[in-house]
Amino acid sequence: MTLKELRRNAHNRLKEQPNISSPELDADLIIMFVLDLKKDELLTKDISVPDALAIEVNAYLNRRLAGMPVQYIVGKTEFMSLDFIVNKNVLIPRQDTEILVETVIERYKNVSEQIRILDIGSGSGCVGISMARYLPNSVVTELDISEEALKVAVLNAEKNLVTKQMNFVCRDIRDGISDLEPKFDVIVSNPPYIKTDDLLELQQEVIEYEPVAALDGGDDGLDFYRIIIKKAVPKKGGMTAFEVGIGQAGDVAGLMFKAGYRNIEIIPDLGGIERVVLGYAA
């Protein structure tokens, strides 16, 4: 079988599943993974594919057809134009979250002193590691309750050449950060914000494969905003920035104002959805 034939067959197989939103892209990612090809090689080469590799491709296609996210199948994804390792212990980074990173970078890119950043609920490390890459004078602490998630973040720091800028802390944020000194210039978080009752309405592949603890924000979706605002305060004049779910920006801004934050901003994403809430500690 030639590479072109393999691609055509793979595309057609995934197109049969209506719940797969990007069948051709997913099929190509699997083929590139199995055959160890780059994108340009996939598009320009028409090599003969050994039967064993074609069988392996079909085995991974079966996993995708069963609902496994393609990012978990190939073990990686792209975020902020960087490559990140992902597995079942971490949420798959979403493009929606890039505006959170971009917002912090934009506000601190001209700061010449060291910038101390705390990323709460770091998961794969995509948020904090991206900031470390694009803010070379930053020192980033990744905090997560999951040891397995932090192991992935450590690998991603190595992969993206920022290990020397990183610290890793395994902790429940409910225990606070008072022992982490000096205080942080920036606290950033993309916390669990889905209402508990709404979890079952998520896509099958999210419910069955991604870690629910990283999604469940309690009855009103705001539990972790309350906890973080209470337990993790940046230094005076420092910034806290959150990603928020649809319709939550006003509530989170209100929580921050009550806690003493000032100059609070709500920032929409490219689709006009209020996606980031930030404020400065008084």
Where does each model-flagged region fall?
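Non-catalytic accessory regions of SAM-dependent methyltransferases
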Residues: 1-40, 47-49
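Conserved hydrophobic residues forming the short capping helix/wall of the S-adenosyl-L-methionine
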Residues: 14, 108, 157, 232, ...
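Conserved AdoMet
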Residues: 31-107
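Active-site beta-alpha loop architecture of Rossmann-like, nucleotide-cofactor-dependent enzymes
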Residues: 71, 194-197, 247
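Conserved SAM/SAH cofactor-binding pocket of Class I
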Residues: 96-201, 226
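Helix-to-beta-strand junctions that scaffold the AdoMet/dcAdoMet cofactor pocket
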Residues: 162, 210, 233-237
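Mobile active-site "lid"/loop adjacent to the S-adenosyl-L-methionine
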Residues: 193-223
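Conserved Class I SAM-dependent methyltransferase catalytic core
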Residues: 219-280
